[in-house]
Amino acid sequence: MTLGMIGLQTTVSTVAVGLQVMFVAYFLRHMVFAVSAMSASAERTVDSHIDHYEAGVGTLPSVTVMVACKDEVLVVDHLVMALDELDYPADLLEKIIVDDGSEDGTAEALDYWAAWTPDLVVLHRPSGLGGGKSAALNTALKHARGDIIIVFDADHTPRSDVVVRHVRHYTDSRVAAVQGRCVVRNAGDSVIARLVAIDYSAGYLVNEFGRDDVFQLPAYGGANCSVRASTLRAVGGWNPNTVTEDTDLTLRLVLIGEIIKFDVTAIDEEEAVISLRRFWRQRYRWARGHQQAARDYRYAIWRCPELSLMERIESMMFLHAFHIPIATMVTTILAGLWMTGIATPIDPLATFVLWTLLFLGPLLELGAGLVLGGHDRRDARAMAFFIPLYFVSGALCTMAWLDAVINRHYDWVRTARRHSPESEVVA
């Protein structure tokens, strides 16, 4: 064996050991979250009673609901009607929708609704200003009068009690933000939409629930989420220099010791992407932004005096969640080297463990989400498609990482809608 081959063998073996350690760590994380969610009391996993304020309506905070819209003419009518159904005292509820340079009739539709809806404020940003959703929300923040800011996306349909379910957490002065649960209403539109529906069940009912239950570190998720207005202004609003303003704000709140809560019963419904192309575009944006957040905040998180050692470890694992699919691609390359005889694994058993952990952790979380989300047999059969989709995620996360390395420019890109919200909800 040449020195070059020996060097390659050593490198491959070292990388394989590193991957095994990484996959074991994330497997344990998936398992802990799944056990936490599956063993939770019924009151935390199903629709529960709302605890009204004992002192009465007079103690309720004022609320500003914000939505950023760009080319959302297919859903904007339903959005306005859904906001009109929110169950909260009218004198304490403000609604602001920002048209972010739309070119498809969204602006005209919003102006029509504003003329007939006295409590709706419509703001217009000229096209070409940049900054994406963050900049649009910051525009709304300048006009907001509410104590609590609640953000929805344009395709979302919040349930009527969602505002009350959010604001009840702010009786605790330590709480700075609250994340609700989003469910998919169009799972039957395609295999991709069905997989996204399962992924959302796992993401909210298992991962987000587990982070809250085990570490008290849920994420502020960007839609169906609320934040204390004074805190948001104190940290400078949303960051217009990132395409995932939610992850960025989550980390800025954590770094100053603020508390984020997750309310599994604060539900709204949204439209999932229906094609692989749209899935790629959406998840690429998530990966690009999340990886940027890892670069921006990982050192600050690790040195944060507000966090315990376990909280720092969990925050680092959360930060690098969109790096793990890249490890899938590295593992695939290693498998190719082993299969072609260019390199050999140290131990065949270790190779088996590596590939098992690669899929078992995510499947544990997805399986728990399938059960807790009340999914049917069609959804269970669709689980088989998660394996190829996992490799797709690995490819897009790798591309996002490489594009950042070479400093390829990327602007915020909205998710295309297919139709108005009239599909069956998967909750």
Predicted regions and their residues:
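N-terminal signal-anchor transmembrane helix
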Residues: 32-92
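Membrane-embedded multi-pass helical conduit in multi-pass membrane proteins
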Residues: 37-40, 47-50, 55, 318-407
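Acidic helix N-cap motif at the loop->helix transition within catalytic regions
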Residues: 77, 104-112, 124, 161
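Long helical/loop segments within the catalytic core of UDP-sugar-dependent glycosyltransferases
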Residues: 114-126, 130-147, 160-243, 280, ...
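Catalytic donor-sugar/metal-binding loop of nucleotide-sugar-dependent glycosyltransferases
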Residues: 250-268
